[in-house]
Amino acid sequence: MAKAPKRAFVCNECGADYPRWQGQCSACHAWNTITEVRLAASPTVARNERLSGYAGSAGVSKVQKLSDISLEELPRFSTGFKEFDRVLGGGVVPGSAILIGGNPGAGKSTLLLQTLCKLAEQMKTLYVTGEESLQQVAMRAHRLGLPTANLNMLSETSIEQICLIAEEEQPKLMVIDSIQVMHMADIQSSPGSVAQVRETAAYLTRFAKTRGVAIVMVGHVTKDGSLAGPKVLEPCIDCSVLLDGDADSRFRTLRSHKNRFGAVNELGVFAMTEQGLREVSNPSAIFLSRGDEVTSGSSVMVVWEGTRPLLVEIQALVDHSMMANPRRVAVGLEQNRLAILLAVLHRHGGLQMSDQDVFVNVVGGVKVTETSADLALLLAMVSSLRDRPLPQDLVVFGEVGLAGEIRPVPSGQERISEAAKHGFRRAIVPAANVPKKPPEGMQVFGVKKLADALSVFDDL
């Protein structure tokens, strides 16, 4: 007589396990997120035999001295997109597990289909689709004008069958589209559930490590823009990237949130065209599409995205409020940071905006999280309040403290050099970031306090 399947209760938000149902998850403190899942009494023998030895070789693992382990780096291979390679840390590492997420229509499947069609001419690849039919994928490839002669396709949702076929085909790169529709026979729950997503991702990661196959898994996102699935999915994978972009914009940004083989928060920029995604080699140019007319409330700053500087424009609109509680709206910037800077501007700059509506926006849909944008945001708000434009050739960056001091930011010299490459001739930066030898033709103003920055602005 077969044993009854085991039951478990798992949180949909963080993946914590519980022996019985409860209203609130004690790990992430979310309410009504714990659901029941059914597990098989024991895993199949074939599954354990096929994928024993997680860290790279089948069989029983052996204890080794750290000094005896080879330091030879695994050879990476290019995806065919320099921007994609940059986000991955220099290319794809064999045996790595990569998770790519994004909103519907962002271009995840298009980017991966273009990548595999390019690589199929050099190496063996496999594209596994569980959401679209093979005919639909073929029509999309034909519409984009991609070479399809050497690309291997598979329509399957069973992870066990996919790994068996992949073991026969032995591809160097395999795409799973998507992880939410895959399932395992051992897990008696519907595809897309917490248990299925967690176990299928762990199963694929184990297969990638033991067989040396690089696997890219496509994942959906939730309402708040985070990758769908439990938090325990993150330790299973080596690299997590997110493809983002506004529905009314043709530009897409690819950002890494976790990378064991490269820098985190690395940014790649693509443009959606009729021939698919095309990489943008100079992202600063698209984020600085300023008109010839000089307007108030606009400033340019240099943010540091991963391993490269990026010039972005910050716009501010300060207007008299007709309501008792003035509005404070921030797009692309943190709302709490805006409130702090308004208080600092009032206390240490002598400018009161308690009766003003304040709207700030980062042009191009870029999300700026680093504090180096503080000084540029403050000067943009002052420019809008006074209706006095900042010079077109001025770049600003620096962190503003609660005492009104201007703090230095990392990579100040590189930021100034990047601004000089794009034709900027003046810069307001923290005094500690002033280079000993500024770029030729660049005038750098070092400021220590907010009052110093406002004084420089008055003299420009």
Predicted regions: what they are:
Residues 2-13, 17-86, 93-99, 106-117, ...:
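Peripheral, non-AAA+ core regions of ATP-driven protein-machinery
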